[in-house]
């Protein structure tokens, strides 16, 4: 019997935001909230590749300003507290008492923030490519190890920024943020494409990955929202996750992290492991940031099959 369910709809969360959500899998199975990354990437069918849809009910939501969600202003009331609140609104709408969280990269940070604020409704937490969402983590993602491994690609990104604004991470992101909000369309498009191309370069040291978004609006959303959250330091206290992770001392947290992750280097999961010794950390060899790297994908599937 086919137990898969495909439900789609829009969630009115106020603030002129209508959020697209959909479910896949077995509605009688274990509910798992899939929290996408970026910020700004949205969800698609590829997000389902980690899961057994015969035993799991996957709930997916395009965050504010992302994917198929609707708004007249992607920046308005778009912050971490609001995203966390949106997950709660969705959980209540779907009449889910408790659910498991799955998040990668930015989605891993959101999963931990949500769990810290709502531990009573969280069963287990599965993460990949941990991002702690501190200012130094944003700086590392944009201006860290990657430029040493891919100097020519990094220079192409820098060429999209006037030399007067290239002296520091702060100058770069503030220039980009100003242009994304106030620049002419030509400058905005050039800058957004350069931002996403640079990030795509860093996704995998194993498989060369290029930006596959042919719709400029999708590229623009990713660049604008990543910059928005970077400039605003994730709308979190600098060490919010590490300072509050002890709230989850009775929760099982599983993390698969690529050894060669150039966007979220290994120092971040090691910091979480130090603050939360109960963390089940699996460092995947010959893998980077991408969840599609073979060893990352195999490890994530193993963790979900074994411990979910």
Swiss-Prot record:
EC number: 3.4.11.5
Keywords: Aminopeptidase, Cytoplasm, Hydrolase, Protease
Pfam family, one: Abhydrolase_1
Catalytic machinery residues: 105 (nucleophile), 261, 289 (proton donor)
The reaction(s) this protein catalyses: Release of N-terminal proline from a peptide
Gene Ontology biological process: proteolysis
Gene Ontology cellular-component annotations: cytoplasm
All copies of domain AB hydrolase-1, residue ranges: 30-290
SUPFAM superfamilies cross-referenced by the UniProt entry: alpha/beta-Hydrolases
Compartments reported by the entry: Cytoplasm
GO molecular function, one term: aminopeptidase activity
Primary localization: cytoplasm
Function noted in UniProt: Specifically catalyzes the removal of N-terminal proline residues from peptides.
Homology family: Belongs to the peptidase S33 family.
Protein name per Swiss-Prot or TrEMBL: Putative proline iminopeptidase
Gene coding for it: pip
């Amino acid at each position: 019997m086919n137990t898969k369910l495909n439900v789609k709809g829009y969630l009115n969360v106020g603030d002129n935001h209508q959020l697209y959500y959909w479910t896949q899998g077995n509605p009688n199975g274990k509910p798992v909230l899939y929290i996408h990354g970026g910020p700004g990437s949205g969800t698609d069918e590829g997000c389902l590749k980690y899961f057994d849809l015969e035993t799991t009910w996957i709930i997916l939501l395009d965050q504010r300003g992302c994917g198929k969600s609707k708004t007249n202003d992607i920046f308005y009331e778009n912050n971490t507290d609001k995203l966390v609140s949106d997950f709660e609104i969705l959980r209540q709408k779907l009449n889910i008492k408790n659910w498991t969280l799955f998040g990668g990269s930015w989605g891993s940070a959101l999963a931990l923030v949500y769990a810290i604020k709502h531990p009573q409704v969280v069963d287990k937490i599965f993460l990949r490519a941990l991002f702690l969402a501190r200012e130094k983590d944003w700086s590392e993602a944009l201006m860290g190890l990657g430029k040493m491994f891919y100097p020519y690609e990094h220079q192409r990104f820098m060429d999209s920024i006037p030399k007067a604004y290239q002296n520091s991470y702060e100058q770069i992101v503030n220039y980009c943020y100003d242009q994304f909000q106030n620049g002419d369309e030509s400058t905005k498009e050039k800058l957004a494409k350069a931002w996403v191309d640079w990030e795509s370069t860093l996704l995998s040291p194993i498989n060369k990955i290029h930006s596959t978004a042919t719709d400029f609006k999708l590229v623009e959303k990713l660049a604008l929202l990543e910059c928005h959250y970077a400039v605003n330091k994730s709308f979190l206290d600098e060490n919010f996750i590490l300072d509050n992770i002890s709230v989850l001392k009775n929760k099982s947290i599983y993390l698969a992290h690529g050894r060669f992750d150039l966007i979220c280097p290994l120092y971040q999961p090691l910091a979480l492991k130090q603050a939360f010794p109960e963390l089940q950390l699996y460092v995947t060899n010959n893998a980077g940031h991408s969840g599609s790297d073979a060893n990352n994908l195999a490890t994530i599937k193993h963790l979900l099959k074994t411990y979910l």
